[in-house]
């Protein structure tokens, strides 16, 4: 089944050209199916790039998805046009009375800030509380996942001495998990962050289970069944060239940065990088959506009751 997004959203043509099944409102209205209602709270500066990355992953399953793009109510995006935000995004204040089968909360390049110093932290905490009554399952990504696990469990993020940057092998620590169905014993995941969550602090919280982890960059994917949440601290959603864009940007700006580990062939930035995570990215998000489909309420309004 396809993902339903506006035909004028930039991702529509991009995904159509890649063979992803997408459809507009007209076709959706002719189908007698209850689509999964998925929200994407996009905290990244490059909204179009990020919304396309996640739409690509959640639009590649047999399930029909109705995607709602959400922004923080008062925060104004500086890197995406006001016209795009007005046309395609709904402020959280406008959707807080709705119910969703799933919600993805993206990362944000604000790791250097304490959580409480983030300008929209108070509203984001409202979002976290709202997920417990209005959302069946939530997926926090990178900083979004760190913020969620901090809010619900007090687990702190820690500044790294050097940026974790590159493609790192991660071990499958829970082969029986429905979220890792079809996963191999290890997989490569893009990493781009200045902070980490410590495994010992996650292990100290009853009920949390680490599903994927790396000896080099630490825990990656954590399940929190008590809050119907997954937290992932790395970037399965990244395009092939995303790390290259970040590296080239820092080099151009004179920002000290190492060549991303295990990304370019022979670690040579002159060579084109290879995507070694795409299949596992689709598996993870497909498994997450399938688990939602198997466990959510048919009557959307019963979620949280």
Swiss-Prot record:
The record marks 111 as: Important for acyl-CoA specificity. It comes from Dinoroseobacter shibae (strain DSM 16493 / NCIMB 14021 / DFL 12). The active site is at 142 (acyl-thioester intermediate), 235 (proton acceptor), 237. It is found in: Cytoplasm. Its EC number is 2.3.1.31. Transmembrane segments: none annotated. One of its GO terms (biological process) is L-methionine biosynthetic process from homoserine via O-succinyl-L-homoserine and cystathionine. Substrate binds at residues 163, 192, 249. Keywords: Acyltransferase, Amino-acid biosynthesis, Cytoplasm, Methionine biosynthesis, Transferase. GO terms for molecular function: homoserine O-acetyltransferase activity; homoserine O-succinyltransferase activity. Pathway: Amino-acid biosynthesis; L-methionine biosynthesis via de novo pathway; O-acetyl-L-homoserine from L-homoserine: step 1/1. Transfers an acetyl group from acetyl-CoA to L-homoserine, forming acetyl-L-homoserine. It catalyses: L-homoserine + acetyl-CoA = O-acetyl-L-homoserine + CoA. Pfam families: HTS. This is Homoserine O-acetyltransferase. GO terms for cellular component: cytoplasm. The record marks 192 as: Important for substrate specificity. Belongs to the MetA family.
């Amino acid at each position: 089944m396809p993902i339903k997004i506006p035909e004028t959203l930039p991702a529509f043509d991009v995904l159509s050209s890649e063979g992803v099944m997408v459809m507009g409102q007209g076709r959706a209205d002719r189908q007698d199916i209850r689509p999964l209602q998925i929200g994407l709270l996009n905290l990244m500066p490059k909204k179009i790039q990020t919304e396309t990355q996640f739409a690509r992953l959640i639009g590649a399953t047999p399930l029909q998805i109705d995607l709602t793009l959400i922004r923080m109510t008062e925060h104004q995006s500086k890197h995406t046009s006001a016209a795009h935000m007005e046309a395609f995004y709904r402020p959280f204040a406008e959707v807080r009375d709705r119910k969703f089968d799933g919600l993805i909360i993206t990362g944000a390049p604000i790791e250097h800030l304490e959580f409480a110093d983030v300008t929209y932290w108070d509203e984001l905490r409202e979002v976290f509380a709202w997920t417990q009554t209005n959302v069946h399952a939530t997926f926090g990504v990178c900083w979004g996942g760190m913020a969620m696990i901090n809010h619900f469990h007090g687990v702190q993020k820690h500044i790294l001495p050097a940026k974790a940057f590159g493609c790192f092998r991660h071990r499958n620590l829970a082969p029986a998990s429905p979220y890792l169905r079809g996963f191999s014993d290890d997989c490569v995941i893009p990493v781009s962050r200045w902070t980490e969550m410590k495994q010992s602090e996650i292990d100290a919280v009853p009920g949390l289970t680490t599903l994927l982890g790396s000896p080099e960059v630490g825990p990656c994917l954590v399940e929190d069944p008590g809050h119907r949440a997954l937290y992932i601290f790395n970037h399965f959603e990244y395009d092939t060239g995303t790390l290259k864009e970040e590296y080239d940007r820092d080099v151009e700006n004179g920002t000290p940065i190492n060549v991303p580990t295990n990304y370019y062939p022979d670690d040579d930035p002159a060579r084109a990088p290879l995507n070694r995570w795409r299949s596992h990215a689709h598996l993870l998000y497909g498994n997450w959506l399938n688990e939602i489909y198997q466990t959510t309420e048919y009557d959307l309004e019963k979620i949280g009751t």
